[in-house]
Amino acid sequence: MLSKDKLDRINVLSKKSKEEGLTTEEKAEQKKLREEYLKNVRSSFKNQLSTVTVLDPEGKDVTPQKLRDYQDRNKKH
């Protein structure tokens, strides 16, 4: 998870970008922070997917094979 300080900095840079523009250094910092944020979001999403089971109205497991394969590859022992 990204620290509150980093999230706050992302928001400050975004606001400044809209209001007055960013310096070259600030643009580089913003890009780095955004990449770190997206990496974190993707990782969290993948962790959530690894625990999902899809059930039909009758209670049968209908989890797509592609998701089952992903879960099998990423099981924690």
Curated annotation (Swiss-Prot):
InterPro entries: DUF896 (IPR009242)
Domain of life: Bacteria
Major location (coarse): cytoplasm
Gene3D superfamilies recorded: Helix hairpin bin
Keyword terms, alphabetized: Cytoplasm
Cellular component annotations (GO), alphabetically ordered: cytoplasm
Residue segments, region Disordered: 56-77
Cell compartments where the protein resides: Cytoplasm
Signal peptide from the UniProt entry: none
Keyword Cytoplasm: yes
Keyword Flavoprotein recorded: no
Biased composition (Basic and acidic residues): 57-77
UniProt-listed PANTHER family: UPF0291 PROTEIN CBO2609/CLC_2481 (PTHR37300), UPF0291 PROTEIN YNZC (PTHR37300:SF1)
Family: Belongs to the UPF0291 family.
HAMAP family from the UniProt entry: UPF0291 (MF_01103)
The protein's name in its UniProt record: UPF0291 protein OB1671
